[in-house]
Amino acid sequence: MSKIIGIDLGTTNSCVAVLDGGQVKIIENAEGARTTPSIVAYMDDGETLVGAPAKRQAVANPKNTLYAVKRLIGRKFDEKAVQKDIDLMPYSIVKADNGDAWVEVRGKKLAPPQVSAEVLRKMKKTAEDYLGEEVTEAVITVPAYFNDSQRQATKDAGRIAGLEVKRIINEPTAAALAFGLDKTEKGDRKIVVYDLGGGTFDVSIIEIADVDGEMQFEVLSTNGDTFLGGEDFDQRIIDYIISEFKKEQGVDLSKDVLALQRLKEAAEKAKIELSSSQQTEINLPYITADASGPKHLNLKITRAKLEALVEELIERTIEPCRVAIKDAGVKVSDIDDVILVGGMTRMPKVQDKVKEFFGREPRKDVNPDEAVAAGAAIQGSVLSGERKDVLLLDVTPLSLGIETLGGVMTKMIQKNTTIPTRYSQTFSTADDNQPAVTIKVFQGEREIAAGNKGLGEFNLEGIPPAPRGLPQIEVTFDIDANGILHVSAKDKGTGKENKITIKANSGLSEDEIQRMVKDAEANAEEDHRLAELAQARNQADALVHATRKSLTEYGEKLEAAEKESIEAAIKDLEDILKTGDKAEIDAKVEALSTASQKLGEKMYADMQAQQQAQQQQAADNAKPVDDNVVDADFKEVKRDQ
C-alpha cells in the first residue's frame, strides 16, 4: 500500500513529510531544501517554474510570478481583503465569471487552486523521488480559520495536482500532533498553538489526553484571521522604505513594478535578519532612474523601528487568543504549554507578546516551519492504518446556519463543535400555499445572515398547498471530518428530499476541475519534454566542446577533407541547438559523432603510442636504479667496518 504523505501548503513556503519506519521524515526537495517557496512563475517559452527557481527570477518577471496565492483561494473578488491585495500585488488579480478572485498571467485566467496545484505537484514529486514509488494520496493542511469554500478550494487544488486528498486537517492541530507524540510527560495537558504564518493567523486550544494507551487530541476551540501574516509585515517595511525614499529622492517607487519586486525581496530579508540582529542595512543600487540619472537606495533599519512599524499587526493576534481561551472554557493559568508555529514566530517581539499574554515562556523545541507537515504525515499514517494509537478530534471554526424569516441567521451548528457532526432542525413555510422553500446556507457569527459568508443555496420543491406554518421541513447539517458541509432538506409530509454538498456559490465546477486536471497532465508532459530537450542540449554542448578541444590537439593529423567534415558537423549542431527539438538535436549529435570517428581513431593511436613510449622509458630507467640499490661491495665495506 502506498504511503499517504502530509503536505503543509503554506502562503509563503510549503513542506512535505511522510512517516517512514515509524519516524516522521521531512523530505528535501530537488534543490536540497526542506521547505519550498510557494511561488509559481510562468515563462514566455511556456515553461512553469515552481519554488526556488521561480523565486530567483521574480525580480525580472514580476507580472508572471505568482506568490501568496493562498490568500485568494476560495475568495470572492469583491471581498475587502482581496481588493486590498489588488493594489499591492505586482501580478493581475481579476474577477472570474462566477465572481471569484482569479489571477491573470500571460493573457490566461487561472483559478487559485490551479496555481496551488503546481506547488502541490512539486511536493508530490519530491515525495515520489524520496520513496521511489508513485504517491496518489495526501493529507493537506489549512488554516484552522479557513471557511468551507476555502477548504473546498484546497481540496480541488489537490485533485488538480493528481492527489486524492484523504483529509483536510487544521494547521494548529497538525502542529499539536507533531508536538504531542514526541512528549513523554504523563497525564492530560492543555496546550495553545499560536500559528503566525506567511498569510494567515490561527490560535487553537488543544487538550492532549492519554485514554487507554491511545493519545487523544481534542481541539477545545480555535480562532484567527485568514488575512494576517508575514506578507503584511513585509508590506509595512516596503511602505516605510517607499516613504523614506520619496522624502530623500522625491521619487515614488510604488508605481514601479520592477522596483517593488526588489523591495519585497529586500524587506523579507531585512525582517529575517532583524530577528537575530539589532540593525540591518537595505542596499539596492540602481533601484530606479529619473532625468538626473540612476538612483540608489541605502537605508538602515533597526529592530526597534521594525517593531514600531508592525506593533499593531502583532497586537491584532491577541484578541483571537482571548476569544479562543474564553470559548474553550479555560483560564490562561490552565495552559501547560505554548507552541509557536509559522516563520513569523521567530520574531522576538512576537515571542514577547505571546509570553506576556499567556504568562509563560513559549516552547522552543518545535520547528515552526516543519511541525505542520510532520503532523499531517502522522495523520496520514493514522488514516492508512499504520498508526492506531492516535485519535484526533477537531472542530469547526465558525458557526453554520440558514437564513430564516426577516433575514435572521438561525445557527444549526455552533462554532468549535467537534467534527464530524450532524444536526437536524424542523422549519416551516412563511406563506400560505408556498410550493417551494429556498435553503440559504451561511457561515459566521453575525445575527443577520447577510453579514456572514454565504456558502450556497438550493430549493426544495413540490410542497403540497397548505397554510403557512403547517408543512414540516427538516433541515439537516452534516459536517465531515474534513470540515466540509453537506446539507439536506426533507418535507416530512411527502418524504421529498433534496441535498447538496456545499460548493460555495462560487467555487470550481466538476467540469472546470476535470479541465484543470487535464491541463495539469498536459503541463506535466510538456515539462517532461522541456527537461528532455534541456538534457539533449547539454549533451550536445558537451560534445561540441570536447570535439573542438580534440580538433585543436589532433587536427593536423587528419586529412583536410576529414577536418572539414567535422567542422561542418559542429556548425550544423550549433545551428540546430538554438531552435531544434530533441529529435533534430539527437540526429545532428549522431552526425557529429560519426564525422569524428577518424579523429577518435587518431587520438586513440596517439595515446597508445604515448603509453608505449612511457613504458619503454620506465623500463630503461629501471635498470640503473637496480644496480645502485644492490651494491654488494658497498654493503661488504659496511660490514668490515
Curated annotation (Swiss-Prot):
Ranges of Low complexity composition bias in the record: 608-619
Keywords: ATP-binding, Chaperone, Nucleotide-binding, Phosphoprotein, Stress response
CDD domains linked to this entry: ASKHA_NBD_HSP70_DnaK-like
InterPro entries in UniProt: ATPase_NBD (IPR043129), Chaperone_DnaK (IPR012725), Heat_shock_70_CS (IPR018181), HSP70_C_sf (IPR029048), HSP70_peptide-bd_sf (IPR029047), Hsp_70_fam (IPR013126)
Residue ranges crossing the lipid bilayer per the database entry: none
Modified residues (Phosphothreonine): T200
Domain of life, source organism: Bacteria
Region feature Disordered, mapped onto this chain: 606-641
Up-regulation conditions: By stress conditions e.g. heat shock.
Gene3D superfamilies for this protein: 1.20.1270.10, 3.30.420.40, Actin, Chain A, domain 4 (3.90.640.10), Substrate Binding Domain Of DNAk, Chain A, domain 1 (2.60.34.10)
Family under the similarity heading: Belongs to the heat shock protein 70 family.
Role summary: Acts as a chaperone.
Name of the molecule in the record: Chaperone protein DnaK
Protein's organism: Bordetella pertussis (strain Tohama I / ATCC BAA-589 / NCTC 13251)
Upper lineage: Bacteria, Pseudomonadati, Pseudomonadota, Betaproteobacteria, Burkholderiales
